[in-house]
Structure formats: C-alpha cells, structure tokens
Design a protein with these regions (language model features):
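A short, N-terminal "cap"/entry segment at the start of jelly-roll beta-barrel domains
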Residues: 1-34, 118-121
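Conserved short histidine dyad/triad with adjacent acidic residue
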Residues: 23, 38-53
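Ligand-binding loop in jelly-roll beta-barrel domains
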Residues: 31, 87-113
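Histidine-centered metal-chelating micro-motifs
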Residues: 47-48, 67, 83, 87-93
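Glycine- and acidic-residue-biased ligand/ion/polar-headgroup-sensing regions
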Residues: 55-66, 71
Length: 121
C-alpha cells in the first residue's frame, strides 16, 4: 500500500469573478475534511467579500501581490512571503493591483462554503 498521493488532476472550482482555483487536496478532490491545498490565480482588481472563516488559512505568494484586511489592518504580501490567519478572524482578500497574483492556500480544517461565513456584498 502506497504511503503517498500524487495529485495531477486538481478540481477546478467554478467561479464567476475570473479567479482560478485548483484544489489539489480537500473536500472537492480527495474528500478530506482536515486540510485543503489549492493553487490560485487572482486577476487584477479582484476582491472577495469580508468573511470570518472557521478554519486557519495559510497563504504563500508565488508571484504578484495580495492584499489582506484583517480586523481593519491592511497588509500587502509580495512573492516569497507568507501569512497564517487564524480561524474566527474577520478578513477580506483582494488583489487591487494591476497584475495577477498567484498563490497557494492551505486551510485547516479544509475549506468549505459552510465554514467560510462570507458577508453579503
């Protein structure tokens, strides 16, 4: 029995805002609820509504910049930087810049629409 899993066909999450989301591990691909790993590309001028997720989220920026508003504090990360945002913290993710932002997001437990608690726009 193999002690590893290679993912070469991630689930591409349907979106309406131009953002690419490829879930490699998590609820949609491997039915794992303890962790999700996703590769994402946020287009220029993209943003999500504020949310208060019930999961920790780790983000690593591959290229470009990503803006976070965490409890009213604005933070901008660039390529090579990372952040951990603890669960039950109000946050907004965005890319208000002129170039796309590519990054990896890891959520524990796994990302789920039932746990994200997005505010109405």
């Amino acid at each position: 029995m193999k002690k590893y899993t290679i993912q070469n066909s991630p689930f591409v999450v349907p979106t309406t805002d131009g953002k690419l989301i490829e879930e490699h591990f998590g609820n949609a691909t491997t039915k794992q609820s303890d962790i999700s790993v996703a590769h994402m590309v946020a287009p220029p001028k993209w943003k999500e509504p504020f949310q208060t997720p019930q999961f920790d989220e780790y983000t690593y920026i591959i290229r470009g910049k990503k803006q976070f508003i965490i409890d009213d504090e604005k933070i901008v990360l660039s390529a090579g930087e990372s952040i951990k945002i603890e669960k039950n913290v109000r946050v907004q993710y965005s890319n208000p810049f002129d170039e796309e932002c590519e990054y990896i997001a890891i959520c524990t437990p796994a990302f789920s629409m039932d746990l994200v608690n997005r505010e109405e726009a």
